[in-house]
């Protein structure tokens, strides 16, 4: 008997040794080409880059994987315990592989199989880290062996907290969220510190099936999984029975970001994205580095700018009348027919509907959802002049655009025309708002920075400034009469015209600019010479290489809204050079400032995300460069305030502010502009078709674009006091008769004169009536260049 027992023991020992040898060989065999697990010590996960407004509102997030890295010591205990209870009960007790868990799962799964219950796994958190970082998702015996070997090795090198940190930051939680910090934000709009036990359990439940566990689609299943995690926490002693009951009884309530925490500024964000990618030299680095980018954007102004631009474009488009229905469908199965239609771009708050019935007084409409409503004829009047019956406008089956108004709808259409608006701080160059079009998602073409257009009469300002720089006084008399410019041998003479074809005769230079008189502008140009005008256009950054041609003075050059707005910003700040900038500073994922918009030490950069406005810096005095002299700058500013007080921008006077500005309309009314400024902001706005064509015979900067400026200022600038422009010491104000230009004891306008020529103006009655000029120019105007009706 003993011999038999001894023999059996020898056999068992031999089998054990053979088994150990096999295991040792397997470990040796699969350990030869394992990935380097030590790389996990250098874990820098791809993190989301976020762009903020100056007042701390989130503008945009960019990432290949939306993740915000959070160190383990910042993750609350209850959240860590939720994952340990859900995924790896013995996490702190095993060496990467839970042998007891494997045996337990094997026996439990036999019962689960027989009773058709969900099978349980025994994969530890460490094994999941190995799978997520070092191996593929291949389902094979070989991968499981490698996974177990690596898990053991990692457990010997890394602490449990280091392993848990890797897992909680790398795991995918659905809704594009990687890591617990992003999951907490995405699902509950909270930081991890603010999560309740129930919310922590919900997040811990997601890794099993993140795409399927959507409470909006399968609430019961998601709640059951969350409650399972809660009960595991109770069983493991992490929470009390009362806390578990409260957590189980709580509903799953998802929360989105509050609107006051975010700002919509798609064109602005895209400009920042492009700028920072160029700065970094790598698109991948931008999308993975977890940068915090603080911009100059003013969230409140941005909202008003978008609203004002869209309102202005819609109002202009409606004045052109109703074009036509976007489609016509059969009413036999109209709901399905509506659903089949291609998506209409730029709907925004508008909706698509089909006309079901039409009477003289209204139209009945239906929506793809099956809902019905009506459009009264009062909401169609804009579409056609003297509309007496809705039947004259719409027919059954017409697919149209509508807007909800109280308990009915109004007929609308998507504007064909487009435009842009940009707001800057003229003293710092900060771009406070930038809206590059009607709808970013319909057209990403940025009409602020990319659209080259003719500025029309906006150019006149710089013709007058060139004259002022060269000693011409603002009360100088010029003849607003016919003028003929020789274009050279064999070419017809150039005969520019005023917008309305009339003449005012002898008028002051001030009146010439206020009323935007083309012929006075040409005479000012001939008096000062094209060379000086070309120089000033380059100096102010309007165009880097303008053609030296007389039609240039009426706006035949090309520029962008950003450039021309910046040029007027220089005037607004007293003549100091500025450069538009969107980005204030950039911090890396660790909070270190890696860029700021000037070279000074930043003493206010370490601010919280809710106090970003404190990081805004002013321009250092040592960096100031004068583009024009202070006296000439104030003189042109004074003339431009006259444009608002008495001239083509008179309707803006009702704003009750001290505003300088200039309207602009290019040849054939293809481009319309208005740029207005105060000592604190400069606002540039533009309207035109993307493929240039006339906006209509009566379309001008005054009628089309100025209303956008007024609407914006009425909202965004209403609480600002009417600050005057500072008068430099080199200027003296003198009362002048506005009609004659003569000094009077109590004139109709206070004119600005330079100190060095104030004494020689009292007897200045010369009328400049030059009909030709000997200045040499290097380009001969053509028929295309003959901007004869600029306003």
UniProtKB/Swiss-Prot annotation:
One GO MF term: penicillin binding
Membrane-spanning parts: 7-27
Gene Ontology BP, a term: regulation of cell shape
Active-site residues, record numbering mapped to chain: 87, 457
Topology, Cytoplasmic side: 1-6
Topology in the lipid bilayer: Single-pass type II membrane protein
Pfam families, sorted: PCB_OB (PF17092), Transgly (PF00912), Transpeptidase (PF00905)
Tree of life domain: Bacteria
Alphabetical keyword list: Antibiotic resistance, Carboxypeptidase, Cell inner membrane, Cell membrane, Cell shape, Cell wall biogenesis/degradation, Glycosyltransferase, Hydrolase, Membrane, Multifunctional enzyme, Peptidoglycan synthesis, Protease, Signal-anchor, Transferase, Transmembrane, Transmembrane helix
Stored SUPFAM superfamilies: beta-lactamase/transpeptidase-like, Lysozyme-like
Region span, Transglycosylase: 49-220
InterPro entries named among the record's database cross-references: Beta-lactam/transpept-like (IPR012338), Glyco_trans_51 (IPR001264), Glycosyltr_51/Transpeptidase (IPR050396), Lysozyme-like_dom_sf (IPR023346), PBP_transglycosylase (IPR036950), PCB_OB (IPR031376), PCN-bd_Tpept (IPR001460)
Places the protein is found: Cell inner membrane
Catalysis performed (reactions): [GlcNAc-(1->4)-Mur2Ac(oyl-L-Ala-gamma-D-Glu-L-Lys-D-Ala-D-Ala)](n)-di-trans,octa-cis-undecaprenyl diphosphate + beta-D-GlcNAc-(1->4)-Mur2Ac(oyl-L-Ala-gamma-D-Glu-L-Lys-D-Ala-D-Ala)-di-trans,octa-cis-undecaprenyl diphosphate = [GlcNAc-(1->4)-Mur2Ac(oyl-L-Ala-gamma-D-Glu-L-Lys-D-Ala-D-Ala)](n+1)-di-trans,octa-cis-undecaprenyl diphosphate + di-trans,octa-cis-undecaprenyl diphosphate + H(+); Preferential cleavage: (Ac)2-L-Lys-D-Ala-|-D-Ala. Also transpeptidation of peptidyl-alanyl moieties that are N-acyl substituents of D-alanine
Associated pathway: Cell wall biogenesis; peptidoglycan biosynthesis
One GO term describing the cellular component: plasma membrane
EC number assigned by the record: 2.4.99.28, 3.4.16.4
Record topology, Periplasmic segments: 28-791
Region: Transpeptidase, residue numbers: 398-711
Function: Cell wall formation. Synthesis of cross-linked peptidoglycan from the lipid intermediates. The enzyme has a penicillin-insensitive transglycosylase N-terminal domain (formation of linear glycan strands) and a penicillin-sensitive transpeptidase C-terminal domain (cross-linking of the peptide subunits).
Family: In the N-terminal section; belongs to the glycosyltransferase 51 family. In the C-terminal section; belongs to the transpeptidase family.
Name of this protein: Penicillin-binding protein 1A
Organism placement in taxonomy: Bacteria, Pseudomonadati, Pseudomonadota, Alphaproteobacteria, Rickettsiales
Gene for this chain: mrcA
């Amino acid at each position: 008997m003993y011999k038999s027992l001894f023999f059996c023991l020898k056999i068992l020992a031999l089998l054990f040794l053979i088994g150990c040898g096999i295991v040792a060989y397997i470990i040796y065999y699969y350990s030869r080409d394992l990935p380097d697990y030590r790389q996990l010590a250098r874990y820098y996960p791809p993190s989301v880059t976020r762009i903020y407004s100056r007042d701390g509102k989130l503008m945009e997030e960019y990432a290949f994987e939306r993740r915000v890295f959070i160190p383990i010591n910042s993750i609350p205990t209850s959240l860590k315990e939720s994952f340990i209870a859900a995924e790896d009960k013995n996490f702190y007790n095993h060496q990467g592989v839970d042998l007891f868990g494997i045996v337990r799962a094997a026996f439990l799964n036999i019962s689960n199989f027989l009773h058709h219950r969900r099978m349980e796994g025994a994969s530890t958190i460490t094994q999941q880290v190995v799978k997520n970082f070092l191996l593929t998702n291949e389902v094979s015996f070989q991968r499981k062996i490698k996974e177990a070997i690596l898990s053991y090795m990692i457990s010997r090198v890394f602490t449990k907290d280091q392993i848990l940190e890797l897992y909680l930051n790398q795991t995918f939680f659905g809704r594009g969220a990687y890591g617990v910090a992003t999951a907490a934000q995405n699902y509950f709009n909270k930081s991890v510190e603010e999560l309740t036990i129930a919310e922590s359990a919900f997040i811990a439940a997601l890794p099993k099936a993140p795409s399927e566990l959507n409470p909006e689609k399968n609430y019961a299943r998601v709640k059951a999984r969350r409650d399972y995690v809660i009960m595991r926490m109770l069983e493991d002693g992490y929470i009390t029975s009362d806390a578990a009951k409260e957590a189980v009884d709580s509903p799953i309530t998802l929360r989105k970001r509050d609107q006051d925490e975010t700002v919509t500024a798609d064109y602005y964000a895209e400009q920042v994205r492009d700028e920072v990618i160029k700065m970094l030299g790598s698109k991948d680095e931008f999308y993975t580095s977890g940068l915090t980018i603080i911009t100059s954007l003013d969230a409140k102004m941005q909202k008003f700018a978008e609203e004002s631009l869209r309102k202005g474009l819609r109002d202009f488009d409606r004045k052109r009348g109703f074009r036509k229905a976007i489609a016509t469908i059969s009413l036999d199965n109209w709901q399905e027919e509506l659903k089949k239609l291609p998506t209409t771009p730029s709907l925004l708050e508008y909706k698509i509907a089909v006309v079901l019935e039409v009477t003289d007084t209204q139209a009945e409409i239906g929506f793809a959802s099956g809902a019905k409503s009506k459009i009264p004829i009062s909401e169609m009047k804009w579409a056609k002049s003297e509309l007496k019956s809705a039947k004259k406008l719409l027919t059954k089956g017409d697919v149209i655009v509508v807007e909800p108004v109280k308990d009915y709808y109004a007929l609308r259409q998507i504007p064909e025309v487009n435009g842009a608006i940009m707001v800057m701080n003229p003293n710092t160059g900060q771009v406070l708002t930038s809206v590059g079009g009607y709808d970013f998602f319909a057209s990403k073409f940025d009409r602020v920075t990319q659209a080259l257009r003719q500025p029309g009469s906006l150019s006149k300002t710089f013709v007058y400034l060139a004259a002022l720089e060269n000693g011409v006084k603002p009360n100088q008399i010029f003849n607003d009469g016919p003028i003929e410019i020789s274009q050279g041998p064999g070419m017809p003479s150039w005969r520019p015209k005023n917008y309305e074809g009339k003449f005012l005769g002898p008028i002051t230079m001030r009146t010439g600019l206020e009323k935007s008189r083309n012929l006075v502008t040409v005479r000012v140009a001939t008096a000062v010479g094209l060379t000086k005008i070309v120089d000033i256009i380059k100096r102010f950054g309007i165009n880097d290489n303008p053609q030296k041609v007389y039609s240039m003075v009426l706006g035949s050059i090309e520029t962008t809204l950003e450039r021309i707005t910046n040029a007027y910003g220089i005037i607004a700040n007293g003549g100091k050079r500025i450069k538009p900038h969107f980005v204030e500073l950039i911090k890396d994922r660790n909070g270190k400032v890696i860029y700021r918009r000037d070279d000074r030490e930043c003493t206010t950069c370490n601010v919280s995300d809710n106090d970003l406005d404190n990081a805004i810096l002013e321009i250092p005095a040592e960096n100031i460069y004068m583009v024009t002299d202070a006296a000439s700058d104030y003189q042109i500013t004074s003339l431009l305030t006259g444009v608002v007080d008495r001239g083509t921008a008179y309707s803006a006077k009702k704003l009750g502010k001290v505003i300088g500005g200039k309207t602009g309309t290019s040849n054939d009314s293809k481009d319309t502009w208005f740029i207005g400024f105060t000592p604190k902001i400069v606002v540039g706005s533009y309207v035109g078709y993307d493929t240039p064509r006339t906006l209509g015979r009566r379309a001008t900067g005054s009628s089309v674009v100025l209303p956008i400026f007024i609407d914006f200022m009425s909202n965004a600038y209403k609480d600002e006091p009417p600050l005057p422009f500072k008068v430099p010491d080199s200027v003296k104000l003198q009362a002048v008769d506005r009609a004659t230009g003569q000094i009077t004891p109590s004139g109709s306008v206070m004119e600005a004169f330079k100190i060095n020529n104030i004494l020689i103006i009292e007897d200045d009655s010369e009328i400049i009536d030059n009909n030709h000029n000997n200045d040499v120019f290097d380009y001969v105007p053509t028929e295309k260049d003959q901007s004869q009706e600029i306003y």
